[in-house]
Swiss-Prot record:
Matches recorded under SUPFAM superfamilies: Mitochondrial carrier
Tissue specificity annotation: Expressed in brain, liver, sperm and testis. In testis, expressed at higher level in spermatocytes, while it is expressed at lower level in spermatogonial cells. Expressed in erythrocytes (at protein level).
Keyword NADP: no
Entry protein name: ADP/ATP translocase 4
Mitochondrial matrix domain ranges by topology: 50-86, 143-190, 244-283
Species, as recorded: Homo sapiens
Gene Ontology molecular function, alphabetical: ATP:ADP antiporter activity
Cellular component per GO, a single term: motile cilium
Lineage: Eukaryota, Metazoa, Chordata, Craniata, Vertebrata
Amino acid sequence: MHREPAKKKAEKRLFDASSFGKDLLAGGVAAAVSKTAVAPIERVKLLLQVQASSKQISPEARYKGMVDCLVRIPREQGFFSFWRGNLANVIRYFPTQALNFAFKDKYKQLFMSGVNKEKQFWRWFLANLASGGAAGATSLCVVYPLDFARTRLGVDIGKGPEERQFKGLGDCIMKIAKSDGIAGLYQGFGVSVQGIIVYRASYFGAYDTVKGLLPKPKKTPFLVSFFIAQVVTTCSGILSYPFDTVRRRMMMQSGEAKRQYKGTLDCFVKIYQHEGISSFFRGAFSNVLRGTGGALVLVLYDKIKEFFHIDIGGR
């Protein structure tokens, strides 16, 4: 007699629209704030990653490193060009991060139902990894065209509109869709899924796991939470960085008559053969600095959820 109501109550908790909506809001607001703050580093990282595949950047005009890029961008393109593509990035990142966080908690409920952390630690740990990876892969399917457009806008150099390849987000999507079809907006999607699972599994899983080991997870001091998040985002970013480099190189091919790479594997091989293994990590230090924004997202998300009095699911 008591089992059926309990089951319905569990289903209601699992698919609570109000809680899901608050998750979207909390994750989205935190993401928008942090991405705007680190937008200049984001652009430097993108340019260093794809300049070898960009027809707009000649070999002699390529950036020598992060410092050279930081100095030349305002001089050649204007100071506010550091935020070029930032609006598209915020639009893209809001649903991406919001969906990641929202789905993560729902997946946690699915994967971790009945799992005792003290008695089944490794099962609990793997459930955290699985929920993070599944959340990232699910949201990527929805927002990939926006991620693609943000990348192309971010590496579109030139001081004036007449020197740029795209006028804005809408123009970028329309031009690529017209020349390559919808498939062109999903160039590099396969390797993106691989990379996002690796990144999100460690990003969410390790953060939740480490925080869960603390005596009072919900009362963790801000600085401690930030330090944990910083270490997690740095390690996750370096681990998945080669996947990110390859996917962005693949993105650069859409809309081009002649393609440099036949596919993901060919891209991996050619980068290694012609540029060396270090090219997979070009811009990685910028990514470490950029990871500060990711760390802020994790911490702000918890604080925003506390503000809305949302249960953080045992963290």
